[in-house]
Amino acid sequence: MPPKSRAGAVKKVRRKEKKNVAHGQAHIKSTFNNTIVSITDPTGAVISWASAGHVGFKGSRKSTPFAAQMAAENAARKAAEHGMKKVDVFVKGPGSGRETAIRSLQAAGLEVGTIQDVTPQPHNGCRPPKRRRV
């Protein structure tokens, strides 16, 4: 049997490089169950992201405006570490966390340029789910 190499060989780990991007886009997807905030550079490459579930909320608490606020703050903080200063906001979906997410991006220190609603509208596409009976 060949002799064993020394225990705990050193592995080279590639570290995430800090992108220095001053202007970008914030994509807020707010559904009835969750809110996802992705901050990208102008080409669309994701720099940071956070969701209500990723921040620590579970179940029906993910769909609250407060959870959306925490997710947006978290994503904005990570983007600011990469040098992000100004964002254009694209909001998608009918959820309750739309406005609070935009406000918390501003509160976290990002300057909001334009705000666009990019919610997809069907031209009579798929049949919607049946009505809820509570």
Curated annotation (Swiss-Prot):
Pfam families: Ribosomal_S11
Gene Ontology CC annotation, any one: ribosome
GO molecular function: rRNA binding; structural constituent of ribosome
Region Disordered, residue ranges: 1-24, 115-134
GO biological process: translation
Start-end of Basic residues biased regions: 9-18
Keywords of the record: Ribonucleoprotein, Ribosomal protein, RNA-binding, rRNA-binding
SUPFAM superfamilies according to UniProt: Translational machinery components (SSF53137)
Assembly and binders: Part of the 30S ribosomal subunit. Interacts with proteins S7 and S18. Binds to IF-3.
UniProt family annotation: Belongs to the universal ribosomal protein uS11 family.
Function summary: Located on the platform of the 30S subunit, it bridges several disparate RNA helices of the 16S rRNA. Forms part of the Shine-Dalgarno cleft in the 70S ribosome.
Name of the protein: Small ribosomal subunit protein uS11
Organism: Saccharopolyspora erythraea (strain ATCC 11635 / DSM 40517 / JCM 4748 / NBRC 13426 / NCIMB 8594 / NRRL 2338)
